[in-house]
């Protein structure tokens, strides 16, 4: 039996999604909880591997099991065995053609900037704090240069293992909600650190340190050293993964927090 899960997690305190020896990860905690409920060893496959400190409201995973449980038993049982900062949002049995990573047609991330003179307290691990006068409209205008299938070498991490730097950005929007600036971006897939590197450069434009044309210039240069520093991980959320309609996976509010879909 193949089962898909929708999960959310606070990435603070974890060394990213992927299971690693001697450090804690979201994958390790989820597999431990699933194995307890299934009463057999469980390994999971995810839609996108998030880095240390990065969060998710819409991560999707799948796993194989011989255990027979109803959806309520999976949800309640797994959540009872997970840490408080990881939770299953939905469960669905899927056919064997479904793969959390390879069946996905798009991923969507939101990066939340707390734009205020003083640092936050309660949300300190859920937003990235940047002071200064950030012009969200200017960031949005500049970000449109990223649309379409392009070479994102200037925005990939040095240690990125992808065979190709080409990705297809479907949409990107930058908006302001009070003291929060939100960068919302969807693509067929993302390179390692791609979203955070894009946000770092957009911030330079929003602060008036670079011209509106800079994102296009960076794409043309194909040189990571020419772009801005990588934005901090705390404000980044994987909020949605798109799959073909045939799988009929549940659709819930994207989040995080108060944000509208």
Swiss-Prot record:
Binding site for substrate: 109
GO BP, sorted A to Z: tRNA pseudouridine synthesis
Pfam families noted in UniProt: PseudoU_synth_1 (PF01416)
Catalytic activity: uridine(38/39/40) in tRNA = pseudouridine(38/39/40) in tRNA
Signal peptide: none
Function: Formation of pseudouridine at positions 38, 39 and 40 in the anticodon stem and loop of transfer RNAs.
PANTHER family (UniProt xref): PSEUDOURIDYLATE SYNTHASE (PTHR11142), TRNA PSEUDOURIDINE SYNTHASE-LIKE 1 (PTHR11142:SF0)
Subunit structure, as described in the record: Homodimer.
Sequence similarity: Belongs to the tRNA pseudouridine synthase TruA family.
Protein's recorded name: tRNA pseudouridine synthase A
Species assigned in the record: Shewanella baltica (strain OS155 / ATCC BAA-1091)
Gene assigned in the entry: truA
